[in-house]
Amino acid sequence: MPRKGSVPKRDVLPDPIHNSKLVTKLINKIMLDGKRGTAQRILYSAFDLVKERSGREAVEVFEEAIDNIMPVLEVKARRVGGSNYQVPVEVRPERRTTLGLRWLVNYSRLRGEKTMEERLANEILDAANNTGGAVKKREDTHKMAEANKAFAHYRW
């Protein structure tokens, strides 16, 4: 941590096509080795597939999917008297978004379809319908927090 106060948070520029900061953040999550153009091509192709398959605006479906993925609670390890407890804590809004995007991209990469565009599009559609790997991850995270509710008084 810096000694001289906090470091200002850099704001991302909204995406030029959809004018959405969330879309820019997703592009940054998809991007590997600094290849932004490739990441943008993947995302825009996936959005075309989403629009074609759902009949709705792709960004609307994407935002609905992210809302279904973002966790409200998570567990953090807390050491008390020689033993570690998994303590449920609320997730900050910024971290909720980050986790949602990370899980969406990671579970897209694990899917079986041939191209990344298809994988991402199908994961977005699944998440919008409350199914798919990313939503399951959120459910598992919430279950873990619920199971460890007894340790909630160890919060800090």
UniProtKB/Swiss-Prot annotation:
One of the primary rRNA binding proteins, it binds directly to 16S rRNA where it nucleates assembly of the head domain of the 30S subunit. Is located at the subunit interface close to the decoding center, probably blocks exit of the E-site tRNA. GO terms for biological process: translation. HAMAP family: Ribosomal_uS7_B. GO terms for molecular function: rRNA binding; structural constituent of ribosome; tRNA binding. It holds the Pfam family Ribosomal_S7. Keywords: Ribonucleoprotein, Ribosomal protein, RNA-binding, rRNA-binding, tRNA-binding. GO terms for cellular component: small ribosomal subunit. Belongs to the universal ribosomal protein uS7 family. It comes from the Bacteria. This is Small ribosomal subunit protein uS7. CDD domains: uS7_Bacteria.
